[in-house]
Design a protein with these regions (language model features):
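Short membrane-interface helical motifs at transmembrane helix boundaries
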Residues: 57-67
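Juxtamembrane boundary at the C-terminal end of a transmembrane helix
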Residues: 126-138
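Hydrophobic packing and interface segments
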Residues: 70-71
Length: 138
């Protein structure tokens, strides 16, 4: 199960990094401005939902086949979906926020987003697992 959690965090960091790269590029080329925040965020959320549905479906089936436990598969896949959506949102929000604060949006790139996403995914994973699997723990 440790391996499953690590994959979730890597996926979140990759999704957030991809989103921030596209937003930073758009800001640098003046294709995006801070007033376009909701449009950019909505686009990233739609991409996140498509990616997470595909990845969670495959992940759910893989865990079900490998571990024969639908509850664990649901917890891990649900965490993966939340992590991807949060990472894509952060990847969009943080560079635009930096631009509004007159900071270099590049400082909001991969390392910061990955760190926040890692912390969030661990928090969500354990809380979701405790909540969903609590009847099995007692």
């Amino acid at each position: 199960q440790r391996q499953m959690c690590i994959r979730d965090r890597d996926t979140g960091g990759n999704c957030g990094s991809q989103a921030s790269t596209m937003i930073i590029r758009g800001l640098a080329l003046d294709e995006i401005s801070p007033k376009d925040f909701t449009k950019a965020w909505w686009k990233e959320i739609r991409v996140a939902l498509l990616c997470s549905i595909a990845l969670c479906s495959v992940n759910f089936i893989r865990i079900l086949i490998q571990y024969h436990d639908p509850q664990v598969a649901l917890v891990v896949s649900g965490t993966l979906m939340l992590t991807i959506c949060m990472a894509k949102s952060l990847g969009c929000i943080l560079p635009i926020l930096a631009k509004i604060l007159k900071l270099d949006p590049a400082i909001m790139a991969s390392p910061l987003i990955t760190t926040i996403t890692d912390a969030f995914s661990i928090l969500v994973y354990f809380n979701f697992a405790l909540w969903y699997l609590s009847d099995r723990l007692i």
